[in-house]
Amino acid sequence: MIDLFYKAYSFWRRYGTRAAIKRIRAELGPKPQLAPAAYSAPVIAPSATPRSAAQLTKARFEALLPLALYLLPPSPHKRITVVTDSIARSSLFGGVGTALIFATLLANRMGADLRVITRTERPQADNVDHILSVYGLTLKGEMQFKFLPIHERNQSSDFTESELFITTSWWTTASTLGSVPASSILYLLQEDERMFYPFGDDRLRCEEILARRDISFLINTKLLFDHLVADGLTNIAEMGSYFEPAFPSRVFRPSSVDKEPGGKRKFIFYARPNNVRNLFYLGIEVIEAAIAHNVLDLNVWDIVFVGKDTPDIVFGNGYSPIKRENMSWSEYAALAGTIDLGLSLMYTPHPSYPPLDLAASGAVVVTNQFGIKQDLRRYSANLICARAERAALVEALRQGVALAINQPLRQKNFLGNGLCTDWEVSFSDTIERLAGRH
């Protein structure tokens, strides 16, 4: 029983209250038609009858079961398939959006159609249209969508042996590997996904996928690539390549609207309490201390929380931050252009997107160090890295405030950014290599 409660608690910590409620309803009531909105490690309830090892393992790792695909005869027509959990609005920021941009550019280069298979939520085509339009991209071929839910095995779809599958997580990779040749898979890896878990079965299975030598890898940033190789995944050096993400000025740029004379400056915090790697609780402690020490003067700064599932909170003598959630990509980009200073934490080696989004939009950003992620000035001199501890981050915010209000220096740093501004440039080498093979 203790183990059951621990699994339920772990599920809640990872996926949040909304997903936990859905899971509880699924366990206690009739099975819903749609699967939960995120890959889950199912809570295994006691059974009246003994189950085999295979049955228990299958129930525990249902998301790893092979995709329900059937093979079609060879066809001269080309298709690329992206396999991901969801393309809902809240899922598109960062990694999934990157996968769709990459797949679109590759499909256009290869003269291929593009299919998106989702596993946890029905695909919403309008969301793909929105992100492509924001970046000025148009798919030349046909766009297709298919929902193959994790928890339902009565739906299937087709594939051909020449089809290229772009997977977006270790679990979508594992599921796809059960149905198509390994040589057909390109795993778009955008985080050290082992760090999603404590040491246990999930982490072990994740590492087994990350260590495979029969699939190709595309890694988001050289920083993450170097970390993975240095941490024992030598197959990544042999079977993988990396890219640096792009931040086109048509999307991320300083706002053209001047601040009102005497108007308050904007401070943003990337607030995702249910994504533990974002160090939400350290972040709010840092903000509280920064206010107490007058680093963030509430007469000068508006505090904005951007994220998901953010609880109501007050700072200082009752100040409530502004909350912005469930924004579209264009709304998020527009907000980023109005920010002066940001705090965005990520307790992994990857720099993560929000600090880079903000730096590309002209803001100063404080983030934390982790492993080989010690300095991000290669991207922008407006990025300040500090140890992941309260005092160090408060001091970094003090430096950030000074830089944010020093408009000439801040602008000079912005103009000297080392961020790529063109996705076609970011992916050019990979796209040419793949186009030559497929």
What role is predicted for each listed range?
Residues L148-R153, D309, S320-A336, P351:
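Conserved active-site histidine-acidic residue motif and adjacent donor-binding/catalytic loop
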Residues G95-T98, R115, F225-K323, M327-W329:
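Conserved catalytic-core segment of nucleotide-activated headgroup transferases in glycan assembly
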